[in-house]
Amino acid sequence: MAQGAMRFCSEGDCAISPPRCPRRWLPEGPVPQSPPASMYGSTGSLLRRVAGPGPRSRELGRVTAPCTPLRGPPSPRIAPSPWAPSSPTGQPPPGARSSVVIFRFVEKASVRPLNGLPAPGGLSRSWDLGGVSPPRPTPALGPGSHQKLRLEASTSDPLPAGGGSARPGTQGLLQGPPTQPQVGADGLYSSLPNGLGGPSEHLATLFRGPADTGLLNQGDIWSSPREVSSHAQRIARAKWEFFYGSLDPPSSGAKPPEQAPPSPPGVGSGQGSGVAVGRAAKYSETDLDTVPLRCYRETDIDEVLTEREEADSAIESQPSSEGLPGTARPPAPRPGPCLGPHPSLGSGNEDEDEAGGEEDVDDEVFEASEGARPGTRMPHSGPLKSPLPFLPGTSPSADGPDSFSCVFEAILESHRAKGTSYTSLASLEALASPGPTQSPFFTFELPPQPPAPRPDPPAPAPLAPLEPDSGTSSAADGPWTQRGEEEEAEAGAKQTPGRDPPSPCHSEDSFGLGAAPLGSEPPLNQLVSDSDSELDSTERLALGSTDTLSNGQKADLEAAQRLAKRLYRLDGFRKADVARHLGKNNDFSKLVAGEYLKFFVFTGMTLDQALRVFLKELALMGETQERERVLAHFSQRYFQCNPGALSSEDGAHTLTCALMLLNTDLHGHNIAETHDLRRLHRYLEGLNEGGDFPRELLKALYSSIKNEKLQWAIDEEELRRSLSELADPNPKVIKRVSGGSGSGSSPFLDLTPEPGAAVYKHGALVRKVHADPDCRKTPRGKRGWKNFHGILKGMILYLQKEEYQPGKALSEAELKNAISIHHALATRASDYSKRPHVFYLRTADWRVFLFQAPSLEQMQSWITRINVVAAMFSAPPFPAAVSSQKKFSRPLLPSAATRLSQEEQVRTHEAKLKAMASELREHRATQLTKKARGKEAEEQRQKEAYLEFEKSRYGTYAALLRVKLKAGSEELDAVEAAVAQAGGTEDGLPPPHSSPSLPANTSSQPRAQCSDSEARAGAGSGRWKP
């Protein structure tokens, strides 16, 4: 047996304090503050029949032996506000209640049936909520056993009833003539089952005459604070019969208790008549064969009675709140003896009680009774109400226990099933095997909460709450706090989505003590940070249920190892996810990165070789600081594997970042100025621990990066998805494909593949990049001719190394070489004389390519088909940007296919042709009347070049579509034949050698070049050199 305080929260959790040291044989000590009385009038039971509330419900098991509510009077010296811990004003919140119940736990060694026979319906010592059960037959006791049972009530169960006192002639559960107890050591301690002895002078006050006790009002103090009530005598007798069997012979008849009629005034000690109502109590025959036999250690009777008797006066003086609204209560004279205890609250489960002992045999219950209103009679018919606040979502019913009992049973059973202690004691065995400094009582406090809406709710006057003592205040610092955090972290990870997690058991607020001490740690599942919220579902899955992080700082090494292994093996992750997990700024990500880099062995490698190996395993993506963190982890691992290669880890990190920048400068697009070795050496001066890096090392690294650029992996899954979309004949969604992270201006960027598009032409081509976007100069090392096999599929010209195969998927490099031909124009390169059968292809972003065909016919076929496809599917352009400046800007050309029909497309192209011709005339007329200089003249030249090119392009589109419509066929072979037959004059088709952007008369020029106007027409582009 042990003593402590437990608080029940509204979510169903509880917290129990370490046991208090009982004051042995010190009746003169201070009386502790009495608990509030709102729980005394309620009932509760620990039942095993149903599952506990909540999403993780399971069958509840037996936890404790029968226990008895411990009740006591309020201390006349201490009377703080009952709501002091939670309300600064001392007033209770509206509709809120706070209940404290003190229980006594006894572990039974063995159970014997009543009088050698099992009790009918099983013995279930419970009072459930909801009504009054019919009285059960109780065996009568002879006169010889009355004295012993009364002494047992004083020693074994010192629980005085709520206002009831023992009087001669009381009719109720105890039968037989009254006998005056013998106050002696032999007479008292001979009845104790464990043979405990103690001073007898403190027990003399237990048996006083009935005239010393009167019926008092609320707030009064007992006139005789040391009397043994009839309720305590019945409890003692029931316990004696429960543990040791009945003293009556088995043949003794049992008759149900009867309600004692009110005694007329003047009977006994001359006081007024009262109401004596018998109550029935059923006791549980539980299966405790596995419990070893133990002696029962008892506490000092004087101490217990002194602490509890004053509370009974306040409880007895309260008006009863258990009666039904509207129930007629006959008035009774105020001065009168309490002839009987409060009638028992029925369980409301008559069907279960009459069904036999199949369910009741496993029930272990506790009960809390309420003192009856003085001088009032409560009928046995009709359900009674209890001030016990119901937990949310639960209500008492005839098919299951009340919410208080169900939640309490679930808490104790769950902690016992986990093999942990729900108190600061070592295990549950300590409850039944107390030490010499432990008390046999537990205090459980229910938090104030608004009750469920009920008609005419009773309003009992609350008593002062129980002040937490030293054992209660140190509950959060007990040895079970850390274990409880781990269990709560596990429970929080397994919590069903959409459900609120239960409140922590070890919260200081559950005791009403305010803020937690500085030394205690908050529960893990209540701390959420930005870094923890960044974890996606895959990372949480890798962490497991017990690897919850707190503010990104409490990392679990085992979880980091599991996640790093899965990232390296790409088990449930993509390559694009690896850098995102390694680049976070928290301790867990650092652990994951350290474990991930352990899979790489860079021993004996140079820095550039190790960097190439590392970048092939992940796609280095994300923001600059995220990528820098990933490179920092790589540098740390490289220095661990090669401690002698560089002077420090910081030096390795500096060189790694320098190589990344050098790779961009040497191989990136649109870089006006490249770095050389001298500039690299100048940039790295003094960054090697205050010194310079060896020149030979920098020279080797520079040569390696210049000869072979760094390649890192792209998202293969996204690449496969894009290829599958190209091969899917019936797509539902068209997604924009992004190019690899290594080329900033790849032709494959911003392409919208057309799944299921028709293949219009394929054949061998030789390509040369003549100008980058906006007609910028292409670097000299990227201008060479390369052989490809061209595939015109939809609005995209794919260039692949191998010959075209219809069922073969395209590779990454082939996708990067693709060119979109929306708003493009192909013309014969008559000005280029180095190679035969060459034609130009200018794209919408003003890139220029040179293509060489195997023959003249193939060149004409490629030019015609590219222009026809562009004319068929190019959508009308968007308006140009509007600005307060007069700077010229080209309109936006959409890459999506048009939704117009071919007739409407022809009319659109013709309208744009007329508009461009009219605008060109106006622009030239403006130039003749106004001589511009400087930037204005440059802008006028750019606009004129643009208008000339657009007029030629729309004229070509309109002419080709008119020929196609006149041919009346969708086959491009027929269109080619019609174009060749027209000769380019009848329908206004421009000659194949003409080019609106590249001058046709270039005999004096050795090679093709952009004109000055075209070079200036590129937005911000530089001028081409002749």
Swiss-Prot record:
GO terms for biological process: regulation of ARF protein signal transduction. GO terms for cellular component: cleavage furrow; ruffle membrane. Keywords: Cell membrane, Cell projection, Coiled coil, Guanine-nucleotide releasing factor, Membrane, Phosphoprotein. Its main location: membrane. The keyword Lipoprotein does not apply. Residues 300-313, 349-367 have a biased composition (Acidic residues). InterPro entries: PH-like_dom_sf, PH_9, PH_dom-spectrin-type, PH_domain, Sec7_C_sf, Sec7_dom, Sec7_dom_sf. Interacts with ACTN1. GO terms for molecular function: guanyl-nucleotide exchange factor activity; phospholipid binding. Residues 168-184 have a biased composition (Low complexity). The gene is PSD. Belongs to the PSD family. Residues 514-708 form the SEC7 domain. Residues 758-871 form the PH domain. The modification Phosphoserine is found at residues 126, 156, 722. Residues 71-95, 328-340, 447-465 have a biased composition (Pro residues). Guanine nucleotide exchange factor for ARF6. Induces cytoskeletal remodeling. The keyword Membrane applies. SUPFAM superfamilies: PH domain-like (SSF50729), Sec7 domain (SSF48425). Residues 934-943 have a biased composition (Basic and acidic residues). Residues 25-97, 126-196, 246-403, 436-538, 924-943, 978-1026 are annotated as: Disordered. Pfam families: PH_9, Sec7. Residues 1000-1012 have a biased composition (Polar residues). It comes from Bos taurus (Bovine). This is PH and SEC7 domain-containing protein 1. It is found in: Cell membrane; Cell projection, Ruffle membrane; Cleavage furrow.
